[in-house]
Amino acid sequence: MSTKNKKAAGGNGVAPKQTRQQSHDSQDYSSFKTVLFYCMLIVFLPVLTFFVLKGFVLDQFLDISEVKVNIASAVGAVVALHIALGLYIYRAYFGAPGSKGSKTD
């Protein structure tokens, strides 16, 4: 009789395991989206900054030589890269609100 009770009580053991797996999957997907966002930011923000500064800001509004425009655009791109990296490090160090992981055995 004890096996009947165990089977009856243990039949619902699959649902919490599946719910836990879905929870882990959603956490993994959320982490993937965050890392993908910061990777895209780190790659594309400096490139976009370089060409926006070069093409729209420095060439049209300031009357300086081509070499100085390129140097100023490169400096702007480096600053943009450091800002993106700083945002990523800040997010990685302090974490998102409510992302405190709980240990499960």
Swiss-Prot record:
- What are the alphabetically sorted keywords of the record? Cytoplasmic vesicle, Endoplasmic reticulum, Membrane, Transmembrane, Transmembrane helix
Taking the first listed entry, what is the main subcellular location of this protein, grouped into a coarse class?
A: endoplasmic reticulum
The record places the following residue ranges in the Lumenal compartment, namely 58-68
User: Which cellular components does GO assign to this protein?
Assistant: endoplasmic reticulum membrane; endoplasmic reticulum-Golgi intermediate compartment membrane; ER to Golgi transport vesicle membrane
Give the range the annotation lists for the signal sequence: none
Instruction: Share an example GO biological-process annotation for this protein.
Output: vacuolar proton-transporting V-type ATPase complex assembly
- TM helices/strands, residue ranges: 37-57, 69-89
- Return the annotated region ranges for Disordered: 1-26
- Record carries keyword Transmembrane helix: yes
Subcellular location field: Endoplasmic reticulum membrane; Endoplasmic reticulum-Golgi intermediate compartment membrane; Cytoplasmic vesicle, COPII-coated vesicle membrane
Question: Which HAMAP family does its entry note?
Answer: VMA21
Q: Which family does it belong to?
A: Belongs to the VMA21 family.
Role played: Required for the assembly of the V0 complex of the vacuolar ATPase (V-ATPase) in the endoplasmic reticulum.
Tell me what this protein is called.
Vacuolar ATPase assembly integral membrane protein VMA21 homolog
The opening ranks of the lineage are:
Eukaryota, Metazoa, Ecdysozoa, Arthropoda, Hexapoda
